[in-house]
Amino acid sequence: VQQWGVAMATATKVITQLRNEGLVSVTPGVGTVVAEVSPTRRPRLAQRSPADSGATAERIVEAAVAVADAEGLAAVSMRRVASEIGVATMSLYRHVADKDALVMQMMNAALGEWEEPDAPPERWRERLEVAGRQTWELFRRHPWLAPAMSITRPQAVPNALPLAEWVLAALDTRGLDMGTTFTAYITLFNYIRGTAFNIELEAEAQAQTGIDNEQWMDHQEPVLTELLTGGQFPTFSRLIQLDYDFSLDRLFEFGLQRLLDGLAMMVGDNQ
């Protein structure tokens, strides 16, 4: 980065894109290197014929989501999106007022991927489990989505309502007042969203360092072991002996079940 005068943010975006397309890979102790064998590349936007080469709201949002999925929301700009679909930047403004409006449409498109199961569970807990896992998968597919959404200043995104309605309807059968029901829904959503924040942060860290979280922990183990040699933290020291495999997916599922355990106790349901 210093040698070539490239900003860290720019280098991070480029490396992330190359990794997503299978052109580079992470080598332990070395960093990011050119991949020996090119895996299946990340799907790119379909090439359009001259007849349908004009900008449309759908194409603009599709291109913006693809950029954000690959490189993060910071990489999305009107100029970048116009370049992706092969049109002049100013032509986008006939369909989207500005980047803030574009991000709103991106969120709406991503949340619109949620579909109610064909055979939804009847019991409230099973329904919330399904909703929680579906929401987690949405954030997995679109790492930028969790940071883009707000709990304290919620955006009016139409496609957020079907999922919210589905969860609220399940909780509404438990005899809670509407305020408590809504608070339970927000708590569930914010837990999933908060955990999902780490997805994009980890992707950025991998791009910057060239190592994944497991390799990073391996590098930290000698330092941590030295910190624990004094015997001041005997309980924590026992963790060093464990072959603990950290996983965001496992962390999410553990927290989801404990949160639902708490709701079950609150509504007096031992299902």
Task: Report residues per predicted region.
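Append "Primarily bacterial transcriptional regulators
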Residues: 1, 11, 18, 81-82, ...
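Residue cluster at the C-terminal edge of the helix-turn-helix DNA-binding motif
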Residues: 3-4, 20-22, 70, 84, ...
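Short coil turns linking two alpha-helices in DNA-binding domains
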Residues: 7, 85-89
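HTH-adjacent hinge/linker in prokaryotic transcriptional regulators
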Residues: 16-70, 100, 105, 109, ...
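Ser/Thr-centered, proline-biased regulatory motifs
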Residues: 29, 74-80
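Hydrophobic alpha-helical connector segments
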Residues: 117-156, 162, 185
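Hydrophobic alpha-helical bundle segments that form small-molecule/ligand-binding pockets
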Residues: 163-189, 195-214, 218-219, 266
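C-terminal peripheral helix-coil segments that are non-catalytic and often amphipathic
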Residues: 201-271
